[in-house]
Amino acid sequence: MSRPPIDLRSDTVTRPTPAMRRAMAEAEVGDDVYGEDPTINRFQDRAAQLLGKEAALYVPSGTMANQLALRVLARPGSEVLCAARAHVFRYEAAAAAWNSAVQLHPFPDDDGLLDADALDETARDAGHHSPDVSLIAIENTHMPTCGRPWHTEEVAAVGAVADAHGIELYCDGARIWNAAVALGVPALELVAPATAVMFCVSKGLGAPVGSVLCGPRDMIREARVHRQRLGGGMRQAGVIAAAGLVALDSMIDRLADDHRRARRLAEAVAERWPGAVAPDTVETNMVCAIAERLPRDLLDRLDAEGIRAGTIDTRTVRFATHKDVDDADIERVLKTFEGITRE
């Protein structure tokens, strides 16, 4: 009998837990377009409370949550300052231009951060030849640097720039719970300077579908209107929101196990192929390895052994740990590494 595959391509491949499936089967539902789904309402209230915001809105995806935030917080014809490799800039099909008529201004993000001084200078330089800056968007954790978390003081520095210029700060917090667990601080502290924040429940938290946008009550009310325009009303979606409630109650603290396993994996990669990865840079659940330091056929060799890994780009191989990868799985991966030689 063949062994089940070990899927390290992304933390989006997780499957609902038995507790989630029971909650989904028993969920009380209503029509959420009318605001009448009690499970969704509880889920939204719980999310807002955990992140210190007034209200929240459940939406089908993180991309939709990001785009709703930009549509409400950024003025048409203005500029949004963001990281050069931010999800909102690189992976959302120019939706900000299409939906919100805003221009994204990317900044270098080699270490996963935005330089507060550079943001401040750009915000000051806006003149009649340049668009006004209406929003700064950050991503915590920063996926392209393999889950590098923003520390509280780093977020605060960017928040101070936003405050000084009277502009909004938005946090794409798809993996904000990974950041909070890695840093040992409440998530609400990490997002306190931000007007609004989004998080996903379908990544490390293991729920099947959706993201939650949290922010001021008036903003969320307007975002609900734009959600409808984008076709994001999901009617009796309490059946999936129920899994999100279970995730918030029981899946956050266990992210520490994912982080520990990612570090173990990084140490093994570094030992097997020196220079491919620096283990001390692995703070959350992702390991990024330099492709040219690895065997050219590594992904194929792993796949032949039932182990799936992915890439961020042509230069970077990524391994993402999650709840469906346990210690025995990691040991199986490490043993497989031992049998693969570097060309």
Please report, for each region that a protein language model flagged, where it lies by residue.
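Conserved PLP-enzyme active-site core in the AAT-like
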Residues: S2-E305, A309-V325, D329-T341
